[in-house]
Regions:
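Sec-dependent bacterial lipoprotein signal peptides
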Residues: 1-21
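Cross-family detector of peptidyl-prolyl cis-trans isomerase
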Residues: 21-227
Length: 227
């Protein structure tokens, strides 16, 4: 009986050891990538290093603050309409919902209707890239130096902000809040794909909040066809 017990314990112990090793490797890679992204930001976008968001480990560049008289989109669960263009660290466009960006990438097609994404943004993430969901739901923080240099241009009164209608922002994200590789589909692709475990730069602009996205998009498509 003791022999059988020892016999059964050996593979279980081995499985636990392998699981522990895999977890340690994943955690080590995340730490390595975060350090590598920080080094890249320090070299290429040192002005954004203080704009680090601890929940998600990404950096932000606020291009336009949006209409500050309106409620932030994270106030309650809602469907959000937003333009989206994603690039790798070399600046190559991976996917885009923007016609001008598609022309820049050389992938524009007159048969593609370039409309914003419609995604549900709730208290739990069900359909958004993790980093974009975190940016939509959380209060973001700007570094003191960045805030002082840009507050007048952006019309800000606080280094803390939330996304709302008209906000245009760039996110520099580690793969941990991106997913396992990225590529465009359905005419929205760029000239490249993003391999897994690679950082991703997303430029997004909040275009609207939508109660019925199917009805809205159907109307947009009908208008496009009429034109």
């Amino acid at each position: 009986m003791k022999f059988i017990t020892r016999f059964l314990c050996v593979p279980v112990a081995g499985l636990l050891a392998l699981t522990s090793c895999a977890k340690d490797e994943d955690e080590s890679y995340v730490q390595f990538e975060n350090q590598a992204l920080e080094a890249w930001m320090t070299q290429h976008r040192s002005d954004l290093v203080q704009n680090y968001q601890s929940d998600g480990g990404y950096y932000i560049d606020l291009i336009e603050a949006g209409d500050q008289s309106l409620d932030p989109i994270g106030k309650e669960p809602i469907w959000v309409s937003f333009d989206f263009t994603g690039r790798d660290l070399a600046g190559n466009i991976i996917l885009t919902r923007n016609a001008d960006s598609a022309r820049l990438a050389g992938t524009f097609s007159k048969y593609t209707h370039y409309v914003p994404f419609y995604r549900y943004c709730g208290t739990e993430n069900t359909g958004l890239m993790e980093g974009t969901w975190l940016a939509m739901r959380n209060t973001l923080k700007l570094g003191e130096k960045y805030y002082n240099a840009n507050k007048d241009r952006l019309g800000l009164r606080s280094p803390e902000l939330q996304l709302r209608y008209g906000t245009k922002i760039q996110l520099y994200m580690p793969s941990s809040v991106v997913g396992n590789g990225v590529e465009g589909t359905g005419g929205y692709e760029g000239q490249y794909t993003l391999s897994s475990k690679r950082p991703f730069i997303v430029t997004m602009e909040i275009r609207d909040t939508v109660n019925n996205p199917l009805e809205r998009e159907g109307g947009d498509v009908d208008g496009f066809c009429d034109d």
